[in-house]
């Protein structure tokens, strides 16, 4: 299941490449220095979406669970503090990805925001 979510996030971020708002938000996500993270943005978003599968609200316990159960799928998992910082910085992208999933799978429910409108609103 994690692989499916990760593949969807990769497809989502590929579709945003070249967009000026996306480039601006990526520069804010990376900070003034080059990115020091061990996980890519796609992995961070995928792991945070996958958290809903386990129904854990506590990020610390989820981090321990990933470290023990998914060490083969996520071998370069950072320590808890860096994982928490990356999760907090990626909230905008998680919301945009969730909107992307709703748009892909909508039948009756129609959202009024495009992905870029959500990125602008949250930022």
Predicted regions and their residues:
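Short alpha-helical elements
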Residues: 1-123
